[in-house]
Amino acid sequence: MLILTRRVGETIIIDDQIKVTVLAVKGNQVRLGVQAPDEIAIHREEIYHRLMNGVGDDAEMEKK
């Protein structure tokens, strides 16, 4: 696992097409912004596991 330190407003780039920006830090929560092509699905981990297990519907899906 790669571990990075970023401050609010700073960005990391993944594979020249995905940008992850730290938008805010409040207590133990971090707000991230993700820019990616439409064909790349983006989910919170817990939602992803539900989708992979066949639980939930489109209303629960979180896409950018």
From Swiss-Prot:
Chief subcellular location: cytoplasm
Chain ranges passing through the membrane: none
Pfam families, per database record: CsrA
Molecular-function annotations in GO: mRNA 5'-UTR binding
GO terms, biological process: mRNA catabolic process; negative regulation of translational initiation; positive regulation of translational initiation; regulation of carbohydrate metabolic process
Entry keyword set: Activator, Cytoplasm, Repressor, RNA-binding, Translation regulation
Signal peptide extent: none
Compartments (UniProt record): Cytoplasm
Any one GO cellular component localisation term in the record: cytosol
UniProt function note: A key translational regulator that binds mRNA to regulate translation initiation and/or mRNA stability. Mediates global changes in gene expression, shifting from rapid growth to stress survival by linking envelope stress, the stringent response and the catabolite repression systems. Usually binds in the 5'-UTR; binding at or near the Shine-Dalgarno sequence prevents ribosome-binding, repressing translation, binding elsewhere in the 5'-UTR can activate translation and/or stabilize the mRNA. Its function is antagonized by small RNA(s).
Protein family per UniProt: Belongs to the CsrA/RsmA family.
Complex formation: Homodimer; the beta-strands of each monomer intercalate to form a hydrophobic core, while the alpha-helices form wings that extend away from the core.
Record-given protein name: Translational regulator CsrA
Organism name: Dichelobacter nodosus (strain VCS1703A)
Taxonomic placement: Bacteria, Pseudomonadati, Pseudomonadota, Gammaproteobacteria, Cardiobacteriales
